[in-house]
């Protein structure tokens, strides 16, 4: 918990409290997740981002009871995190609709990787329930389909571009949004060519925004081949910014 406190305090300082901060929590035990909610109840955050219990693959009925129990217990609103390729269980749309009725469940980070499921939920979700895509390479499609925004690794590197894509789509300027998207879609693929966050850390380190590309085992730093590709893409983007 001490390490988590340090990370959160750093983030709160960096955001200067102008941006909402959601604390990510995960675990396979409802009881222990409640303890984590108690431990963080007085932290100066705005909400929680909570994924499904991993590894144990509970039923949909179990997922509803799990998240409702956490929402009843939490001091801050919860954003569901549906990422079945990491947790091994998918929150179905019927389950999501049931959970969306809880007043303390505010939205979802959608990484179901099934566009048909995502569109179906967007069309059926209750008013005020926010959907944020977390699939970097599918950002343009998700925003075009009606997602409210995104939580993206790639946006750490190209924040203004990703923000402009959302703004342009909301203004009905699809062609301009597509042009902006085409300028970053290759980057989204590079950043996930090897397990994240190693590629992004390499990029930020090369830009001297962080002190080291080091990651903790079992994660490892990027391969020499990917480092070469990342460095080349960084140089290409730097050249684009030079005056003609």
Give each language-model segment a name.
Residues 1-90:
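Active-site beta->alpha loop and helix N-cap motifs at the rims of alpha/beta catalytic domains
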Residues 147, 151, 158-244:
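C-terminal alpha-helical cap/extension of soluble enzyme domains
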Residues 8, 40, 70, 108, ...:
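Conserved, mostly hydrophobic/aromatic
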Residues 1, 5, 33, 67, ...:
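A general structural signal for well-ordered alpha-helical segments in protein cores
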Residues 32, 62, 117, 175-176, ...:
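An acidic, carboxylate-rich microenvironment
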Residues 52, 80, 88, 102, ...:
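Generic secondary-structure boundary/loop-capping signal
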């Amino acid at each position: 918990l001490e390490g988590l406190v340090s990370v959160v305090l750093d983030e709160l300082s960096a955001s200067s409290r102008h941006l909402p901060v959601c604390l990510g929590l995960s675990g396979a035990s409802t009881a222990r997740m409640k303890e984590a909610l108690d431990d963080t109840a007085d932290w100066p955050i705005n909400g929680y981002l909570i994924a499904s219990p991993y590894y144990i693959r509970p039923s949909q009925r179990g997922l509803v009871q799990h998240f409702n129990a956490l929402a009843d217990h939490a001091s801050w609103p919860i954003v569901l995190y549906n990422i079945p390729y990491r947790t091994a269980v998918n929150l179905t749309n019927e389950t999501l609709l049931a959970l969306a009725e809880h007043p303390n469940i505010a939205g979802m980070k959608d990484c179901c990787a099934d566009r048909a499921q995502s569109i179906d939920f967007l069309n059926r979700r209750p008013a005020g329930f926010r959907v944020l895509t977390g699939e970097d390479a599918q950002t343009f499609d998700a925003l075009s389909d009606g997602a409210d925004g995104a939580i993206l690794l790639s946006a750490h590197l190209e924040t203004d571009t990703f923000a402009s894509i959302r703004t342009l789509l909301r203004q009905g300027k699809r062609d301009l949004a597509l042009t902006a998207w085409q300028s970053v879609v290759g980057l989204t693929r590079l950043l996930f060519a090897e397990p994240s966050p190693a590629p992004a850390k390499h990029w930020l380190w090369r830009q001297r925004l962080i002190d080291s590309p080091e990651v903790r085992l079992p994660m490892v730093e990027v391969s020499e081949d990917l480092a070469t590709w990342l460095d080349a893409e960084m140089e290409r983007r730097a050249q684009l910014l030079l005056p003609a």
